[in-house]
């Protein structure tokens, strides 16, 4: 069985991460749409989204993503993205406010075995942030680069008086990433076939896309409704 989480053999400069975060602080950070999953303050801005809007923080698989205007100002974030030699989907900054909690939940089809991997790069964090995946604490430090299988139960609690902010990059598995993950001790021989969306999942995707009207999102909705 593959690890529930693993640190990647790459680290990034904390001072550069925090400098670029400062460029993003003036943006309107959008509250996470699933209010039942957290208590306190959980917000985000997008560097790459389905509509190209900074405020579009939804993340669904097998949908085209484009860079936002914010990414064009964030050269170091783009350099980090380019390190991953694979297709990227949603790229976001996720902020968990002081004394806030993301309740335990699962995100479907977000394991490496499903052909997907989500990367976390902590920009602001501290010892009072408790990140658990499959009941095991993941000790992420600023500048480190981590993968976790978010199809497993996971939760985060920020018990500090400071925000916790991560850069997250959603990636599509390929030969390059297989070599990387094999070096990290993963069995890369397994690969799940792409799944068809259930009616309920389609409706959820359509609902979230409808919250950010755009020509691109309208096309995605039409394609989903036609299937």
Region roles according to the model:
Residues 1-84:
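Non-heme Fe(II)/2-oxoglutarate
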Residues 93-112:
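Conserved short histidine dyad/triad with adjacent acidic residue
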Residues 95, 112-128:
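Short, conserved beta-strand element in jelly-roll/cupin
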Residues 103, 122-142:
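A short beta-strand-loop-beta hairpin characteristic of the jelly-roll/cupin
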Residues 103-105, 129-131, 148-149, 153-160:
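Short beta-strand His + acidic residue motifs that chelate non-heme Fe in jelly-roll/DSBH
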Residues 117-122, 145-147, 161-179:
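A short hydrophobic beta-strand segment most commonly corresponding to one strand
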Residues 169-204:
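Double-stranded beta-helix
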Residues 210-219:
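Charged, low-complexity interaction regions
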